[in-house]
């Protein structure tokens, strides 16, 4: 997640990303509904190559709505000052497991997961969390989840 002023590098990046679409990695704005874009302007960038209509509909439906609501939750919580909502832009890198097309999806859980994750990421970004002191103190005690699975030969 990147947050910054629309009249600076983040605004420039949003304009470039939305204007330079890449097949399978569409960049879309976070919206509450087809004609209701959230503030701050939030651009979603998929980390997974989109290959199916079902995946697209889940990403551009449930996930998009969850992210949009998470942004507004962050404004409501004061993590993003309401008076800055029209001046800031957010770029969200989105990962949705490609196997989502092969399982029965609980859209309420997927929505809430993305809503809460977005609000939490914004909170951390706006409060400079984790701090460099925390990172240095906890570096040796923090293991990346998938790295650990690899060590345990579970990948």
Where are these regions (language model features)?
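Accessory interaction regions appended to the cores of large information-processing enzymes
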Residues: 2-155
């Amino acid at each position: 997640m990147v947050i910054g002023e629309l009249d600076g590098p983040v605004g420039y990046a949003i304009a470039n990303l939305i204007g330079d679409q890449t097949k399978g990695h569409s960049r879309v704005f976070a919206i509450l509904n087809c004609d209701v874009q959230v503030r701050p302007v939030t651009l979603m960038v998929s980390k997974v190559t989109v290959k199916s209509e079902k995946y697209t509909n889940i990403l551009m439906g449930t996930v998009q709505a969850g992210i949009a609501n998470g942004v507004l939750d962050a404004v409501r919580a004061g993590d993003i000052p309401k008076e800055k909502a029209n001046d800031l832009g957010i770029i969200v890198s989105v990962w949705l497991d490609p196997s989502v097309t092969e399982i029965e999806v609980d859209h309420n859980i997927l929505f809430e997961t993305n809503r809460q994750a977005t609000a939490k990421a914004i909170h951390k970004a706006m409060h400079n969390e984790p701090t460099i002191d925390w990172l240095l103190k906890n570096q040796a005690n923090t293991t990346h989840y998938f790295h650990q699975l690899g060590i345990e030969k579970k990948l």
